[in-house]
């Protein structure tokens, strides 16, 4: 056993200080370039195990070797000839080439869908349409946000007191502004300024008082309301 291990180590370390420099060990083929070293490799694979072999090693960012363990039957260290190349050299860092093509196709399809969405929905995020806000037609269509400070605000509509009644929409209540002088002239003309106690102006108050007084007068034996 010791002789076989020494022969194996000699065959592995003859090309460098460690066995990682050997091309056959790096590729995980289980073969050596020289046919004289084939019996030592066969003995080494018999000692390693019967049900697993190591796939190709990969070097990560820390320059450390990582092997992917592939389960299966090992016949003298050589992988089965009927196995697929992807399963023979399986590695978590090396994906098959058809997957890259599928990812590229999926990316192109996603980009196409995004272009169609943005074509039909020009304002997908804030759902802001400048045509519905006439203030932006004066200040520019690129202004999509309003200033929070009313003193420096340019997107806010002007004050109602400075807008004539003709420019306001017809559906707005109290569009006709009444001057105080006109109102006082109407009060003087109707003589309301001489009346100290104005009558009840809300609807139903007089009728309610009449019914209450009538019921109380018709039934004097009862306590009046």
Curated annotation (Swiss-Prot):
A Gene Ontology biological process term: positive regulation of transforming growth factor beta receptor signaling pathway
UniProt superkingdom: Eukaryota
Keyword Repressor found: yes
UniProt keyword annotations, A-Z: Activator, Developmental protein, Differentiation, Nucleus, Repressor, Transcription, Transcription regulation
Localisation: Nucleus
InterPro entries membership: CITED
Keyword set includes Repressor: yes
GO CC term, one of those recorded: nucleus
Role of this protein: Transcriptional coactivator or corepressor of the p300/CBP-mediated transcription complex. May be involved in sex determination, early gonad development, left-right patterning during embryogenesis and differentiation of the adrenal cortex.
Family indicated by similarity: Belongs to the CITED family.
Protein name: Cbp/p300-interacting transactivator 2
């Amino acid at each position: 056993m010791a002789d076989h291990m020494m022969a194996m180590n000699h065959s592995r370390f003859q090309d460098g200080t460690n066995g990682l420099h050997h091309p056959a060990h790096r590729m995980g083929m289980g073969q050596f370039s020289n046919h004289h070293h084939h019996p030592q490799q066969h003995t080494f694979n018999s000692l390693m195990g019967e049900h697993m072999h190591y796939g190709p090693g990969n070097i990560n960012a820390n320059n450390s070797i990582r092997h992917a363990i592939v389960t299966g039957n090992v016949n003298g260290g050589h992988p089965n000839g009927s196995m697929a190349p992807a399963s023979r050299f399986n590695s978590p860092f090396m994906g098959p080439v058809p997957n890259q093509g599928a990812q590229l196709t999926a990316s192109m399809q996603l980009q196409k869908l995004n272009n169609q969405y943005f074509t039909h929905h020009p304002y997908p995020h804030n759902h802001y349409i400048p045509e519905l806000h006439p203030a932006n037609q004066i200040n520019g269509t690129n202004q999509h946000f309003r200033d929070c400070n009313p003193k420096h605000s340019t997107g806010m509509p002007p004050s109602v007191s400075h807008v004539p009644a003709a420019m306001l929409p017809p559906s707005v209540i109290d569009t006709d502004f009444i001057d105080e002088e006109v109102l006082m002239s109407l009060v003087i003309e109707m003589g309301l300024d001489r009346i100290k106690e104005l009558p009840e102006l809300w609807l139903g108050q007089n009728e309610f008082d009449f019914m209450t007084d009538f019921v109380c007068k018709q039934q004097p034996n009862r306590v009046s309301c």
